[in-house]
Amino acid sequence: MNETSNNFEFEICANSVESCLAAQEGGADRVELCAGIPEGGTTPSHGDIVTARRLLNTTKLHVIIRPRGGDFTYSDLEMDIMAADIDACREAGVDGVVFGCLTPEGDID
């Protein structure tokens, strides 16, 4: 982990493996890898995830888990997809995943 002032961790949102490497070079403590930035961030490809994991050696890798843009209210099928993506991230050795789910009323689910 890189040392930063006041014990803050420096996280960068990256939309490619190249961006992950630039963040590491710039001293980021953690990278949040995502795709679909115009949609608010979606789950990146498996290839991007495993390549970023292989190449990042001083920066933690977190992966956004989000099957689509739009709201954060997911169907049962979308929840199954998210669970499979989380399993794949675990197998790839990522340091963490990032996700959010809401009820139709807008409460945290």
Predicted regions and their residues:
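Residue-level signal for inorganic ion chemistry
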Residues: C89
